[in-house]
Amino acid sequence: MPVPEMKYCMQCGTKLIMRYHEGEKKEIAFCEGCKDFRFPVFNTAVSMVVTNESEDRILLIKQYGRDRYILVAGYINKGEEAEHAVAREVREETGLTVSRVQFNHSHYYARSNTLLLNFTAVVDGMDVHENSEIDSYR
């Protein structure tokens, strides 16, 4: 599924034109109203390999009535640092407190126009507090 291209400036609403950008060495959307280039917009999310202090267990969750277990994940809020989003999402979905965060890798998913940042999140204990965010865990 192709990602839709921006047609109008998100700042002022002016129709965008394509203009050569010297630094990018290609044409980029340009707003004549703002006199600025408009680079593609995408979602940013985090996924976490949630593990205990001894790193001998990994937490997987089921959500939204789906059949398979997945990593804890969620979107980064505007203005939020990725590491903060890691701790927030783990706490919201499991009730666990993150003590250490390490970046692993990133991957762009065209289908949802999302850049996914993967981290290892070490938590204090594995006593998950079930709530409406998850269906089950293991």
Please provide the spans of the model-predicted regions:
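Nudix hydrolase/Nudix homology domain
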Residues: M1-E5, D67-Y69, N131-R138
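Surface-exposed, flexible loop/turn segments at secondary-structure boundaries
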Residues: I17, D56, R66, Y109-R111, ...
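Unchanged
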Residues: I76-R100, H105-R138
